[in-house]
Amino acid sequence: MRSSTLQLVERSPVSAAFASVREFGFFAESTYKVSKQSYIKPEFAITNGDGLNVFGKDHGGLKYGGRIDYLPFGLFNNFGQYRQADLERELTPKFVIGANYSYNVGISDRRGSQSGTILYLDNQNNELLPDYLKYGIDFLFKYRGFSLLGEYVNASARVPSGITKYIRDNGSIDTFVL
């Protein structure tokens, strides 16, 4: 769900803390009917991992992500799955539960939204960047104007052991004292 479609004024704290924006890459999604009224919707992406449609120097590696949604009561009307409020006033209960996973190889920003704001170096001044893993689960229920939304996200980083220096925002290099 995009933060611009939230019912409340504030952007989702989860999106603000964990989401990268405007990824550039390959995206694939589909919808499969699995029974009389239930569907699954898988999504997969391989992106640059730095967000914000990076056109300059792209630090780090690729980001691999996937998501799967299960809709046991059928599809939402008029893409209602992607908006927080039940603007369509669903006449029958609608529910979606989804799980997501992403792995960013060599992240150069605290959440992968700008290239090069975090740069670490080894003794030979080669970039050594942490890998970033994120996974979560969420749900959305709507019925006759009522909507209920919940989500859980967990994130972690694997930091390489050879890091000895970092580049500050002003371009100067500092050495770690361990």
Cite the ranges covered by each PLM segment:
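Detector for outer-membrane/organellar transmembrane beta-barrel domains
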Residues: 59, 69-72, 76-178
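Surface-exposed coil loops of outer-membrane beta-barrel proteins
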Residues: 1-69, 76-88, 109-122
